């Protein structure tokens, strides 16, 4: 779950825990982002087995370069759809790196991968080999 204000991460995790949630991952990125950020530090708070832990990460831990917010900013839905299709088609850009950053963290935090670098590799492979584009196209066919 993305939280725009990093100071609310632990409080939000505590609320989720009191409400009976067993697992949750909350993230907040530099610049008030509700996702991990390529700008600099991002915080991750994990609720797992009743325990709340936190960590701070930077893009370099993922093997990625930093980027300004202006380089990854989206736009209206139509523009964002084009951006997503370009990323899923293998276009290399800071926007792709932002997808890799957040996908990698999800893969590590869910136990699918052991390191952020491995998460980036797996996510990058799915983008490069057409797996994600195929999935997008199947979803389009099923949409009303």
Regions found by a protein language model. Name each.
Residues 1-144:
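Glycine-rich anion-binding loops and their surrounding alpha/beta cores
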């Amino acid at each position: 779950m993305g939280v725009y204000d990093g100071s609310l991460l632990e409080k939000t995790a505590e609320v989720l825990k009191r409400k009976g949630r067993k697992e949750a991952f909350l993230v907040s990125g530099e610049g008030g982002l509700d996702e991990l950020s390529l700008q600099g530090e991002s915080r991750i708070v994990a609720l797992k087995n009743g325990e709340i832990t936190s960590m701070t990460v930077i893009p370099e831990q993922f093997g990625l370069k930093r980027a300004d917010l202006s380089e990854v900013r989206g736009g209206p839905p139509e523009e964002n759809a084009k951006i997503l299709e370009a990323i899923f088609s293998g276009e290399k850009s800071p926007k792709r790196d932002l997808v890799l950053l957040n996908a990698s963290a999800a893969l590590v935090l869910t136990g699918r991968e052991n390191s952020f670098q491995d998460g980036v590799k797996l996510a990058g492979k799915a983008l490069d080999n057409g797996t994600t584009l195929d999935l997008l196209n199947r979803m389009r066919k099923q949409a009303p």
